[in-house]
């Protein structure tokens, strides 16, 4: 695959919440290497400006509305992670140590002001674990939107896998389809996520039979909807 953009290529970001050590204000950032110490950040060169705006909106909301942050040592506090994917529209998932997020409408309105159409999910994770998401994600604001994924449009749920680099994804899929261009047998795609590669192959190789295999319920639901749209 040819080398493409080195910067601002990621369509997804996942950031833990933390309190700043000196000011005590809520921040978002990445973990320091081999620690659970969060290094606050306002911008990341691997993401577009959308991520900087998201970080500002979410941290200002948490600070202004005095929303508590989860602390591993005590097991108390609400906000654990924010996970966001920016395709045609913005999808945000708040991972929380509880079931209810106060003042959610305030955050939603601010995000809509900056991003237009916004979809928000809440994932409850009350376990003492390094895993980001809980067992699922509940839609709490807006509705799931079809996203332009190159050749196809599809809904991508927050727990579904999708390549984080759109350009590299398209380049890889083109090469795979070219490699299989004369193949007319059975093809199995394992860990298929939302089924985007499966759909590409099915469209281009009319004589081949392809089966997608995926265990995540949300991704399977997205993939089935995408396959139905091909008929």
Task: State the predicted function of each range.
Residues 8-12, 25, 77-79, 140-144:
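Short beta-strand-initiation
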Residues 4-10, 79-81, 188, 194:
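Feature of Fe-S/electron-transfer and energy-metabolism proteins
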Residues 11, 90, 184-185:
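Nucleotide donor/acceptor-binding cores
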Residues 1-71, 87, 101:
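Extended interfacial segments that mediate partner engagement and assembly in macromolecular machines
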